[in-house]
Amino acid sequence: MKKGDVKKVVLAYSGGLDTSIILRWLQDEYDCEVVTFTADIGQGEELEPARQKAEMMGIKEIYIEDLREEFVRDYVFPMFRANTLYEGVYLLGTSIARPLIGKRLVEIAEATGADAVSHGATGKGNDQVRFELTAYALKPDIKIIAPWRTWDLHSRTKLIEYAMRHQIPVPKDKHGEAPYSMDANLLHISYEGKALENPWTEPSEDMFRLTVSPEAAPDKAQYIEVDFERGDAVAIDGEKLTPAALLAKLNEIGGRHGVGRLDLVENRYVGMKSRGVYETPGGTILQVAHRAVESLTLDREVMHLRDELMPRYAKLIYNGFWFAPERLMLQAAIDQTQQTVTGTARLKLYKGNVSVVGRKAAKSLYRMDYVTFEEDTVYDQHDAEGFIKLNALRLRLGKMARDS
C-alpha cells in the first residue's frame, strides 16, 4: 500500500513507545487519519496516559475500553470448558486475548468509517497471524497494515532515533535494550526474548510479577473451594463473583502461594520454536478445579471424546482460528458436555502446588453404594464374567488364528 490507498486506520494502541512510533509512522507514510484503540484486558496498567499521549500526537478519535468481563466471560471461560492446553502445558494466555482485540479493531473501523486496521505485532511471531485472521474472518475487505513487516526500523537504535526526531517522548528505561518482552492480561503474564533466548538459562527471580517463588511461599497451606455452574466458575469459598473478579481473586491467591509458573519451548505457527516463561496462577487453579468437578459429573465416553478433541481445539486457538467455523463447531460440542458440570472442588495450595482434596456435586455420577469395598446389594459381581468374555472374544480368536 502507498499514500492515498488508506484514508483512515484504527491502530491497536498501548501508549507505549513502539505503538506511539507506529502511530506517527502511519501518519507520515500514508497521510491518513488515525483512530487509536486501547483495551483494558487486565494488564494492570493505567490507561489514561495512553489517552493523553494520543491527544498530544493529534489524535481526535480515541477509544479506551474496559473489556475485562467480556474477555473472561466470552473467551477465557469457554476455552477452559475444554481444559485446554497447547502442547500439553500452555494455558494459552496470550493466544486467547488476540481475538477480542482483533474483533474490536474491526468493529471500531466499521463504526468510524475506517478502511484499515493496524497492529504492532512483529513479522516473526504468532500475534500477527491471530490479529489478521480475526480481521479477515469478520471483515473480508479490510486493509491491514503491519509496520514491522514493511518499515526499516528494525533496531532499538533506529526506533529511538525516529522517536526523538518526531518529538515522541522516550522513557529513560527505553534507551537500552530490555532484558525481555512482556505481555500481560487477566489470565497471565508472558516473558520472551533477550535474556530468555538461551533455553538453558534460568530466569531471574526478579522478573516474576504475579507469583512469589515457591520457596518463599507461606509454610502453611491454604484451602479454597471453587463452585462451578455448567462448566464455568461462579464462586470462591461461597462468594459469588463476576468472571473477571473471580479470575483476579484466584490470581491473587495463587500468586501468594507460587502457583502457576511455566517455562517451556513451544512451536510457533510461523515455523520456529521459541522459549517463553509464563505466570498463570488463577488459570492453573481454575483448570485443576474444573477437572475435579468434571470427574464427578461427566460421562466417561463424553469426557474421553472431549479430551481427544482438546488438542485440535487448542491448536486452533493458538494459531489464531478463534472465528473459524471448525472452532465454532468444536465449541458447540464442548459446551454441550458442560451442561452437567455443576459442583464444588476443594483445593489445597502449598508452595507452588495445587492439589484436589475434595469434590462434590448434587447430580454426581459417583455412587458410593456401587464402589464400596464392603458388602453391597446393588452390584452383582457375576455380571463381570460375561462382560470380560465378550471383550476377550476378538483377542482369543486372533490368537487362535495366528496359532493355526
UniProtKB/Swiss-Prot annotation:
Pfam families: Arginosuc_syn_C, Arginosuc_synth. The lineage of its organism: Bacteria, Pseudomonadati, Pseudomonadota, Alphaproteobacteria, Rhodospirillales. Homotetramer. Its EC number is 6.3.4.5. The gene is argG. It comes from the Bacteria. Keywords: Amino-acid biosynthesis, Arginine biosynthesis, ATP-binding, Cytoplasm, Ligase, Nucleotide-binding. GO terms for molecular function: argininosuccinate synthase activity; ATP binding. It catalyses: L-citrulline + L-aspartate + ATP = 2-(N(omega)-L-arginino)succinate + AMP + diphosphate + H(+). InterPro entries: Arginosuc_syn_C, Arginosuc_syn_N, Arginosuc_synth, Arginosuc_synth_CS, Arginosuc_synth_type_1_subfam, AS_cat/multimer_dom_body, Rossmann-like_a/b/a_fold. This is Argininosuccinate synthase. ATP binds at residues 12-20, 39, 120. L-citrulline binds at residues 90, 95, 126, 130, 181, 190, 266, 278. It is found in: Cytoplasm. PROSITE patterns: ARGININOSUCCIN_SYN_1 (PS00564), ARGININOSUCCIN_SYN_2 (PS00565). It comes from Rhodospirillum rubrum (strain ATCC 11170 / ATH 1.1.1 / DSM 467 / LMG 4362 / NCIMB 8255 / S1). One of its GO terms (biological process) is L-arginine biosynthetic process. The keyword Nucleotide-binding applies. Belongs to the argininosuccinate synthase family. Type 1 subfamily.
